[in-house]
């Protein structure tokens, strides 16, 4: 709810800055009060959105809820479904008043998030644009597939389908689509059961072992960039 944070406006780095670039500011980094002081500084503000929080009352992902497009209230993520003056409504109104202080350029990391942000009543009148996250092509480039398979103890023959996310069982990452598509593929092409495998990386990847009609090779969570390159 952004009620605690650190006042950065007194820092030399802030005073010397020509532009202020915000990213993810939650969990005690910046409060709405701190953000207000930043906006009052008169410095140009760019805010890169890594989720929906800047454009909603309190949620980081609105899922099916569209209240943020008009005004947050009766939040489905609050116990009992919230009410007209619930936490989401109060924070929404605070943000709406706060954003009037200065123009903000909101940058999203995907076109999907750009569309969501542009539909928010909070960001009306502000610039919203999309700049996808860059990829280090010196690191992430094609490698020897056979060596990679050997490294992860994967079959040298056959096709491998790759699926990964921070948490495999998070429905927002498409796990249901993966299961459904694999079942459909096995139904229409049963011969693939002996030549296709599914490589999964991310937390709880082991849980997919018995949910797919193909062999599953679970690599668990991967944090090392060089390991990701090999995958």
Where are these regions (language model features)?
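A short, charged, and often flexible helix/loop element on the N-terminal side
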Residues: 1-6, 24, 79-87
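Short hydrophobic "strand-cap" motifs at the C-terminus of beta-strands
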Residues: 109, 131-134, 163-167, 201, ...
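Donor nucleotide-sugar binding/catalytic pocket of nucleotide-sugar-dependent glycosyltransferases
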Residues: 54, 69-145, 151-154, 160
């Amino acid at each position: 709810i952004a009620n605690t944070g650190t006042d950065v406006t007194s820092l030399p780095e802030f005073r010397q800055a020509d532009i202020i670039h915000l990213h993810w500011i939650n969990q005690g980094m910046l409060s709405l009060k701190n953000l207000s002081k930043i906006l009052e500084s008169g410095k140009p503000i760019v805010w890169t959105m890594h989720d929906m929080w800047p454009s909603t009352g309190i949620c980081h992902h609105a899922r099916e809820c569209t209240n943020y497009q008009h005004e947050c209230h009766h939040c489905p993520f609050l116990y009992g479904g919230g009410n007209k003056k619930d936490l989401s409504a109060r924070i929404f109104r605070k943000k709406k008043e706060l954003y009037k202080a200065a123009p903000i350029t909101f940058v999203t990391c995907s076109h999907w998030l750009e569309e969501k942000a542009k539909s928010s009543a909070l960001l009306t009148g502000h610039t919203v644009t999309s700049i996808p996250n860059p990829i280090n092509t010196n690191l992430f480039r094609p490698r020897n597939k056979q060596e990679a398979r050997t490294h992860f103890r994967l079959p040298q023959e056959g096709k491998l389908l790759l699926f990964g996310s921070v948490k495999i069982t998070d429905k927002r990452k498409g796990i249901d689509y993966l299961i459904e598509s694999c079942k459909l593929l096995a139904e229409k092409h049963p011969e693939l059961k002996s030549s296709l495998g599914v490589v999964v990386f991310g937390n709880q990847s082991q849980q997919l072992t018995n949910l797919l009609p193909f062999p599953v090779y679970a690599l668990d969570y991967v944090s090392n960039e060089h390991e990701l390159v090999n995958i």
